[in-house]
Amino acid sequence: MVLLPWTPPYDWAWMVGFLQARAVAGVERFHDGGYSRSFGVEGHRGLIHLAPDEEAQGLRVTLSPGLQPVAEICYARIGQLFDLACDPRQVARTLGDLAQARPGQRLPGALDAFEQAVRAVLGQLVSVAMAARLTAKVAAGWGEPLAESPGYVLFPTPEALSRADPQALKALGMPLRRAEALIHLARAALSGELPLTAPADIDAGLRQLQTLPGIGRWTANYFALRGWQAKDIFLPDDYLIKQRFPGMTPAAIARYARRWQPMRSYALLHIWYTDDWAPAAE
């Protein structure tokens, strides 16, 4: 068991709520205050188990034997998923009053960028719960069962999804164009067209993402937010954001949000999850 530290405060309850609402059955489980999931990387596979240790200020992590040879990679990915490197004091200084209600809120990332890209595409125009159910069906159909852990499957690899029949994906309950977009996404991951690590120029990376079929502006930005854990993403034309800024155009909202650079991703999450928030009069 290893302790991966965080800088307090850390709002574990909020993070669990966010991730649990999007949990993919068969891949991940929340239980007894902790989290378990299947994971595969560099030919190794196994289970990750973790739980918060509030007294020690960190996550207690246990890896199954299959993941021990890639333990450092696993720890780094866990750090990305749970945003353990975040300095909440810096966020508070940048966001000011916006961060006061939830000073320990973090930016949920991803263990695997390709997985997050698939989730982002499957989340288009459906509820969070429906997206999670649909993703679980894809995982069950194209993910490899984890033999040593009955009931768990590995999230499908790009290789597996690149060979999928679009009609079989459509039969799970998605439009044919979305099924075809998933297959293209998998092939783009294999060819390098889909950047799986954050590029030096995030804006250029976002433009590249939007050249892929089925990836529009919202999906590209949401993927960057979580798959790349980009810290300065804002969505001025997001439905909920527009509700929080009544009477303002997306251009005006974008101008307002400049005050939170270079941490607009954190501002976005705070605004999404603060029902009574309203912009200051200017």
PLM feature segments, named:
Residues 1-282:
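HhH-family (HhH-GPD) DNA N-glycosylase catalytic core used in base-excision repair
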